[in-house]
Amino acid sequence: MRKNACCFTGHREIPPEDREPLRAALLSEIQRLYAEKGVTEFYTGGARGFDTMAAEAVLKIREALPVRLHLILPCKGQSDRWHFAEKRRYREILKQADTAEFLFERYTPDCMLRRDDTMVARSGYCVCYLRDPAAKRGGTAYTVRRAKKEGLEVIHLIPVEVEQLTTL
């Protein structure tokens, strides 16, 4: 666990009314983590939705502050089935990231969870967008539970009691 590092986890689908407030919250939280906690390393998994928003927020903040964006990607070809606009954003983020690491050559049944585990292992903080704290399934719920178990400070961009989350 690294105290100067933070990972992001959140849903792929974000309701339209949440998008702008979420972008603002991400920018604010990244700046706060840098100023108050000395966080300079930010990890995202490169998925659609929240991961993309988080990566773009780090890149925006990087224009003014010495922060770095690291992509931990589950497999090559992750974006193959995405829509054209999503693929374009993904490629742009890949080009601008400080590092990009593919964990597997091709998709495996557990590659997404291994990506999540890797980000948690490299971080001291986890910023999340989790709409249902009682969720027992899904990558976001899994990653938040894992982060809590590993002792990371979990920061919810939607107020949720971490204790409400079920154990791994």
Language model features: what each stretch is:
Residues M1-L168:
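Acidic/glycine-enriched connector segments
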